[in-house]
């Protein structure tokens, strides 16, 4: 579909801009990625300045606005990137991280989906502060391995590195419509279009399902 080709072309432009600064780029979607700029191609010591430059380059080359989150780990950077959408930069500094997380609703946590957020709500866990009252053992019992991550995240701890060579575990496609689709015929037509695009991408990569 032509629209997918446009998305892909713009995505490639954005990813090329990221690569101008660092090879440590871990894509999350067509237009979003983690970047580790601790050491970077520009010799800059400021991640905030790099984020500003990248935003400006994206606008200059694609005429699209972008938001950025700057912090010392992936969890906090992702949360920060959602704060100033669609066209801002938000920084979570190390000495302010725990206070920020304590006030944050758990449904804003990166990695907490709707089902988990609902379960947390049932348990009286509504904010980072509530989550912090739980022991690592109790969180692990309730949420499994993810519970250990939540225990660390709420304390501003995330040791995951930016994985530029991350193994692809899924394949998808998305499309944005100018108007909401209310009619079932339109929805099914859109799903059929997206399914065909996923099939095309899977064949191209010789994936099987």
Give residue ranges: language-model regions.
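Gly/Gly-Pro- and Ser/Thr-rich, intrinsically disordered tail segments characteristic of DNA damage-repair
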Residues: 1-142, 146-148, 162, 200
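DNA-contacting surface of Y-family translesion DNA polymerases
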Residues: 116, 121-209
């Amino acid at each position: 579909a032509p629209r997918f080709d446009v998305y892909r072309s713009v995505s490639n432009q954005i990813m090329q801009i990221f690569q101008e600064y660092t090879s440590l780029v871990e894509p999350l979607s067509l237009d979003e990625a983690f970047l580790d700029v601790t050491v970077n191609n520009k010799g800059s010591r400021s991640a905030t300045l790099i984020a500003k430059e990248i935003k400006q380059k994206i606008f200059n080359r694609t005429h699209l606005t972008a938001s950025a989150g700057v912090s010392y780990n992936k969890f906090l950077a992702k949360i920060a990137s959602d704060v100033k959408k669609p066209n801002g930069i938000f920084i979570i500094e190390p000495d302010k991280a725990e206070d920020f997380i304590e006030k944050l609703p758990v449904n804003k946590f990166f990695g907490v989906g709707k089902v988990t957020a609902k379960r947390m709500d049932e348990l009286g866990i509504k904010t980072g502060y509530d989550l912090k009252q739980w022991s690592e053992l109790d969180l692990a019992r309730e949420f499994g391995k993810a519970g250990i991550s939540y225990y660390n995240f709420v304390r501003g701890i995330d040791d995951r590195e930016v994985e530029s060579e991350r193994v692809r575990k899924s394949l998808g496609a998305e499309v944005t419509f100018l108007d909401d689709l209310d009619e079932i015929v339109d929805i099914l037509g859109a799903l059929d279009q997206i399914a065909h695009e996923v099939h095309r991408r899977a064949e191209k990569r010789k994936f099987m399902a």
